Swiss-Prot record:
Organism: Drosophila melanogaster (Fruit fly)
Example GO molecular function: RNA polymerase II transcription regulatory region sequence-specific DNA binding
Protein name as catalogued: Protein gooseberry
Low complexity: compositionally biased ranges: 142-156, 253-267, 300-317
Organism classification: Eukaryota, Metazoa, Ecdysozoa, Arthropoda, Hexapoda
InterPro entries: HD (IPR001356), Homeobox_CS (IPR017970), Homeodomain-like_sf (IPR009057), HTH_motif (IPR000047), PAIRED_DNA-bd_dom (IPR043182), Paired_dom (IPR001523), PAX_fam (IPR043565), WH-like_DNA-bd_sf (IPR036388)
């Protein structure tokens, strides 16, 4: 008779540890929700008393490191390996010595109270206030010792000898180990000398992750242990990462560049010019025209105002000299190159005009049109820069927008300057 595979029911024997049973990462078996058995607890305490490190105990007994540390800390504080609720358990009677001392006090003074026994234990130096048993624990111990001779419970009456054997085994498991753990001494901070720091910094500049041979050589040369050297490199890398993260944070402080340099003015009447010229506070490098503002009639004449920077060297800046125009009673300014002051600002010639505020673009266009038609253009506005002749196209060329109000440089006025002039384009 052929049996189809679809009709066969799969056989599953179950997991090796069913229910609450689990296997930890070390391969040890534990039952979730139940405390560790007492014989393993006692073995943990005995191995710790023999000087075995908790991490080695954890690997050998296949118990988690947290469980080992918790058992050792509780035994060090209370002297008991019995399990209890974390944070809510009552202090256990610490050691058999304390139990025997309580029995002696009870036998010597039968009417003594539990709080008096606790006070006498602290006064005698048997325990301190931190690990002294509570009053309720002492009372529970006294009741247990007084009723240990006869048991009036149903199990005690009916159990007979079996109950006594079980109690002996249970008492053997619950017996506290008579060992004394050494208190952990906190290691003092290592103070490095200047020579040690210099040697460590030299190696750190070469490599941030030295190998074991480099660490051993460095430990021998500095007189430190290899572990201290390794910890120093770890701390030094952390400090370097913190410094790099601090430097990468962008600073939101405003820049110190100011594009509005204060123009310097010199009072000189402008002949045949009843309009007020607009001022250009900075020469645009990108070719865009900036907004024009009238300084109350006293304006700068097309001068590039550089940003006020922190350079305090002797910078080349236009130096203006006054010259008398022949045939007229007016003065004009000629800009030449010389060694200027410490700041890199470029003051240029300006004239005090009648205070005619520029209200609209139409007024400006009409004023420039009238000035171009009358030809009343002062030479210091454009000619003071002494542009080369090849800079502007001929006047007859198409597209020459400067020809309407550009004049050639007067040779006589150029000879009156105190220093040789150079072309300055303001770019």
């Amino acid at each position: 008779m052929a049996v189809s595979a679809l009709n066969m029911t799969p056989y599953f024997g179950g997991y090796p540890f069913q229910g609450q049973g689990r296997v930890n990462q070390l391969g040890g078996v534990f039952i979730n929700g139940r405390p560790l058995p007492n014989h393993i607890r006692r073995q943990i305490v005995e191995m710790a008393a023999a000087g075995v490190r908790p991490c080695v105990i954890s690997r050998q007994l296949r118990v988690s490191h947290g469980c080992v540390s918790k058992i050792l800390n509780r035994f060090q504080e209370t002297g008991s390996i019995r399990p209890g609720v974390i944070g809510g358990s009552k202090p256990r009677v610490a050691t058999p010595d304390i139990e025997s001392r309580i029995e002696e006090l009870k036998q010597s003074q039968p009417g003594i109270f539990s709080w008096e026994i606790r006070a006498k234990l602290i006064e005698a130096g048997v325990c301190d206030k931190q690990n002294a048993p509570s009053v309720s624990s002492i009372s529970r111990l006294l009741r247990g010792s007084s009723g240990s001779g006869t048991s009036h419970s149903i199990d005690g009456i009916l159990g007979g000898g079996a109950g006594s054997v079980g109690s002996e085994d249970e008492s053997e498991d619950d017996a506290e180990p008579s060992v004394q753990l050494k208190r952990k001494q906190r290691r003092s901070r290592t103070t490095f000398s200047n020579d040690q720091i210099d040697a460590l910094e030299r190696i750190f500049a070469r490599t941030q992750y030295p190998d074991v041979y480099t660490r051993e050589e460095l430990a021998q040369s500095t007189g430190l242990t290899e572990a201290r050297v390794q910890v120093w490199f770890s701390n030094r890398r952390a400090r370097l990462r913190k410094q790099l993260n601090t430097q990468q944070v962008p600073s939101f402080a405003p820049t110190s560049t100011s594009f509005g340099a204060t123009p310097t003015t010199s009072a000189a009447p402008a002949p045949n010019m009843g309009m007020s010229l607009y001022s250009s506070q900075s020469w645009p490098s990108s070719g865009a025209y900036e907004n024009h503002a009238a300084y109350g009639g006293s304006v700068a004449s097309m001068s590039p105002a550089s940003s006020t920077s922190g350079t305090s060297s002797a910078a080349h800046s236009p130096v203006q000299t006054q010259a008398q125009q022949p045939g007229t009673g007016s003065e004009f300014m000629t800009s030449t190159y010389g060694v200027g002051s410490s700041n890199a600002t470029y003051p240029s010639a300006a004239y005090s005009m009648p205070q005619t505020p520029a209200t609209s673009a139409e007024q400006l266009r009409s004023q420039f049109a009238s000035a171009a038609a009358s030809g009343s253009h002062h030479p210091s506005t454009w000619d003071s820069y002494n542009f080369a002749g090849s800079f502007f196209p001929p006047a007859s060329a198409a597209g020459n927008h400067i020809s309407g109000y550009h004049h050639q440089v007067d040779q006589k006025s150029s000879m009156m300057t105190t220093a040789p002039t150079y072309p300055y384009f303001g770019f």
